[in-house]
Amino acid sequence: MLVITRKKGESLLIGDDIEITVVKLDDGSVKLAIDAPKKLTILRKELYNEVQEENKKATNFNPSILKNIKSK
């Protein structure tokens, strides 16, 4: 893992087309601006983990429960 120190207004580059800039520093939090291609999905880690968990639940679906649904 690479650890980098940045001040407000400073940036770091990832590859040729991703730039992350420190916009604001508060007590215990940092606001970042991310300039990246629109095709790239950017998620907070906690949201990513939540999506992964929901995907796991969806794969555990039991189709036999559909037998109890009456059609109109």
UniProtKB/Swiss-Prot annotation:
GO terms for molecular function: mRNA 5'-UTR binding. SUPFAM superfamilies: CsrA-like (SSF117130). It comes from the Bacteria. Keywords: Bacterial flagellum biogenesis, Cytoplasm, Repressor, RNA-binding, Translation regulation. It is found in: Cytoplasm. Pfam families: CsrA. One of its GO terms (cellular component) is cytosol. InterPro entries: CsrA, CsrA_sf. GO terms for biological process: bacterial-type flagellum organization; mRNA catabolic process; negative regulation of translational initiation; regulation of bacterial-type flagellum assembly; regulation of carbohydrate metabolic process. Belongs to the CsrA/RsmA family. Homodimer; the beta-strands of each monomer intercalate to form a hydrophobic core, while the alpha-helices form wings that extend away from the core. HAMAP family: CsrA. A translational regulator that binds mRNA to regulate translation initiation and/or mRNA stability. Usually binds in the 5'-UTR at or near the Shine-Dalgarno sequence preventing ribosome-binding, thus repressing translation. Its main target seems to be the major flagellin gene, while its function is anatagonized by FliW. This is Translational regulator CsrA. It comes from Clostridium botulinum (strain Langeland / NCTC 10281 / Type F). The lineage of its organism: Bacteria, Bacillati, Bacillota, Clostridia, Eubacteriales. The gene is csrA.
